[in-house]
Amino acid sequence: MAVRLPRGFRAGATRAGIKPSGRPDLALLVSGLPAAWAYAATQNRAAAPSIHRGRALYASGKPLRAVVVNAGNANCATGERGYEDDRRMAELAALRLGLSPEEVLTASTGVIGVPLPVEKIAKGLPEIGLTPFAEAFAEAILTTDTRPKVAEAEVAGARIVGLAKGSGMIHPNMATMLAFLVTDALVPQEALRAGWRRVVERTFNQVTVDGDTSTNDLALLMANGAYGEVPLKAFFEGVEAVAQELARMIARDGEGATKLMVVRVVGAATEEEARRAARAIAGSALWKSALYGNDPNWGRILAALGNSGARFDPLRVRIVLQGIPLYEGAVLPFDREEAGQAMRAEEVEVLVDLREGQGAGEAYGCDLTEDYVRINALYTT
């Protein structure tokens, strides 16, 4: 079923010839009204020009009207030309939409170190037809993903729709992929930005596929107010639900992955320590390999936990895998064959109780397979 965008938003895409595969690779997301926006971007020191430009636009505090995305070329590490090409992409999109370049955010994803084919973007932008539906945009922004990622929610009549891409080079650091959430709710910009920071910390920053943070990651929330005001608490609960669903989709679609890993940590001294502990477990290559092999190797979970920086007493901590208690201060008697069978599920849950306080947090990851190595041995980054 087609997902309709919130009131006032339109999107579209085309095949501009940026991807060697010939798949759709150039997309626009447009608001008919000036939108308040909140933005989180990669902290990678080799960030792409699109990130530097996005930060400058964000600091200006001015409304946003559109996003232009190219998938297939990161436009990163190409010297001063990359900055000029990024500005040119914004100018071309603004010309296509009748806007000023300062109202247009750019995003790029794909191969690093290759000059951006601006001439293909110039030719492709006029070919993009805009509709009130999400699917064309969601498809065009993909790179090594195996499926589009779209989620939606409704809060007191206002709609929230999220679109994301991400499969590899995914690791927590202020975004972790490309994600675009749009809503027709009317939300003051200051409240939008504060709430978005909390949502990103709890969702997108809790995804890890391979421990590598991309140079181009961003997570954006646009609110154009076309519907009107809604209760802020309920609104951000809806935003977090959409972001969490997208985060799970990204982890489930990790390069070469066969299963989703959900790590829940409770009883931490603080929420931040719980999130940190969950991320450490979800990101452990040893545990991810054991997960692929259906090996209930709780020692790898405990070792990752010990390296997380979260406070706990190993003699009190409790580890449960797929509902099966494995460890509580010492190994517990359990049926390894039964536990291994339980790990064959498409979604595997690790529950850890640190017994230090009330802090709780989740992280999302996947198993580590031979296919991950194969994909990244063949894909030029």
Swiss-Prot record:
Description of how the protein assembles with itself and partners: Heterotetramer of two alpha and two beta chains.
Originating organism: Thermus thermophilus (strain ATCC BAA-163 / DSM 7039 / HB27)
Family in the record: Belongs to the ArgJ family.
Reactions listed under catalytic activity: N(2)-acetyl-L-ornithine + L-glutamate = N-acetyl-L-glutamate + L-ornithine; L-glutamate + acetyl-CoA = N-acetyl-L-glutamate + CoA + H(+)
Gene designation: argJ
Protein localization: Cytoplasm
Major site of localization recorded for this protein: cytoplasm
Enzyme Commission number: 2.3.1.35, 2.3.1.1
Record: residues binding substrate: 143, 165, 176, 255, 376, 381
Site positions (Cleavage): 175-176
GO biological process: L-arginine biosynthetic process; ornithine biosynthetic process
Site note Involved in the stabilization of negative charge on the oxyanion by the formation of the oxyanion hole, residues: 109-110
Cross-referenced InterPro entries: Arg_biosynth_ArgJ, ArgJ-like_dom_sf, ArgJ_beta_C
EC supergroup of this enzyme: transferase
CDD domains: OAT
Name the UniProt record assigns to this protein: Arginine biosynthesis bifunctional protein ArgJ
Pathway assigned in UniProt: Amino-acid biosynthesis; L-arginine biosynthesis; L-ornithine and N-acetyl-L-glutamate from L-glutamate and N(2)-acetyl-L-ornithine (cyclic): step 1/1; Amino-acid biosynthesis; L-arginine biosynthesis; N(2)-acetyl-L-ornithine from L-glutamate: step 1/4
A Pfam family this chain is assigned to: ArgJ
Record's keyword annotation contains tRNA-binding: no
Described function: Catalyzes two activities which are involved in the cyclic version of arginine biosynthesis: the synthesis of N-acetylglutamate from glutamate and acetyl-CoA as the acetyl donor, and of ornithine by transacetylation between N(2)-acetylornithine and glutamate.
A GO MF term: L-glutamate N-acetyltransferase activity
Active-site positions on this chain: 176
GO CC terms of this entry: cytoplasm
UniProt KW keywords: Acyltransferase, Amino-acid biosynthesis, Arginine biosynthesis, Autocatalytic cleavage, Cytoplasm, Multifunctional enzyme, Transferase
